[in-house]
Amino acid sequence: MGIPLMTTQGIIAVASAHLASLAGHTFNVLTVTKPVSRDAAVNLSRIISKLSPLLGNLIEFNTVEFLNSKDEFEGFGLWRRQDPGFPDTVFIGKVEPTPGFEIKAWFPLATEITARFKDSQNHFINDNTYVAMLAWLPEHLIYGKPCILDVCVASGKSVAEARDNHYHNPPDYLVLEPEDTKARTRNLQQTNTNGLKF
């Protein structure tokens, strides 16, 4: 699977293939026990998606370790998690522009929005950041360990453009880019788009 010259796109391609191989993988980081009754199962089914933010972070940690265990990256750099920061995971090494992944854990049965993606198109000018969406469910639908159902990796640039093209519909709905806040400390910089509906 090695490629002769590691470039930004080459590293993203190799990492994307490894991420795709996570489909069917069960993360041994948390176990939700089997409900003791039918009522307990109904109640659990209503709240199980609340685990998505926690599992999203655990998946991010595990993804960095998983990618760093792959031989193809040896000698070129290491994957690092950025928290807080954008994107979630970056490849620190000899390759420019820096490759990265914004990792989204998506719970398909959620009763609220999961895997939100509001990042500005400004982040994707070099097309070096990709979005990795990992769809997960507990291995027994509402209980068990988190299991990755499937993985989708796409250019962050194409996702942001498609989102903005879909929603931006003046004068009814406007997608607004964030203000220039580079002079602020990192934790106060605005990076997300906003929607304005009239």
Describe each region flagged by the PLM:
Residues 86-90:
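Structured, beta-strand-rich domain cores
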